[in-house]
Amino acid sequence: MSLRTKVIAALTGATMLGGAITGVIQHNEGLSLTAYKDSAGIPTICYGETKGVKMGQRASLSDCQKQLIQSAGEHAKALDGLPMQLSDVALLGALDFTYNVGVAGFSGSKVKADLKRLDYAAAAKSVLAWRYISKYQQKSPGTGWVYKGSNRWTFDCSQYINGQRNKVCWGLWERRQWQSKAIGNQYKNVNAAVSALTKYGG
């Protein structure tokens, strides 16, 4: 049995882990029945779905719930290669992280490399490095953006602007903090991990 099989079984079998997976993604992504552009300018719908999404697109709640289970199962393929001993809490955090950064992003990350060694502390630290968003345009998108060359601008989502939490992507930073604790196996169980979401804005 692989971790991907475990996730799919949890999602389709309505288990505690399956409920936690969908609950975390729903909380962290939020729900939109109409397509919108996320903080990086990518068309998004339902619970953070970006694949094949076009502006103007609409979906029903039922469509979004089905899509979430299917998409979470597809994202679970990024867990291939991780040890079966990976805790459910770390698995929950890793799947939410993958849902946000994509299968390729997680698969090539230091986070996954750390989890392969079951080095939860290192993985927790590695997650926090994923706090930047990028935009490609000639002029600065605004305060706090840093030019990286070739019309690429980056924004550190953990930064304060004029003493206030930034309004660009602070929610992403809060999500990374929760993911860091989950991937770091710092919650007692999946229920405690889900309950901890209320501390963060999501």
Which residue ranges define each predicted feature?
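Solvent-exposed coil/turn segments that connect beta secondary-structure elements
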Residues: 48-50
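Long, amphipathic alpha-helical surface segments
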Residues: 2-11, 20-40, 53, 58-72, ...
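Flexible, active-site-adjacent loop/turn segments at secondary-structure boundaries
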Residues: 34, 43-45, 84, 97, ...
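Structural recognition of the beta-strand scaffold that forms the well-ordered cores
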Residues: 44-46, 93-96, 122-126
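Active-site nucleophile-His-acid catalytic modules used for acyl/amide transfer and hydrolysis
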Residues: 74-112
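A structure-centric signal for secondary-structure junctions around beta-strands
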Residues: 39-42, 91
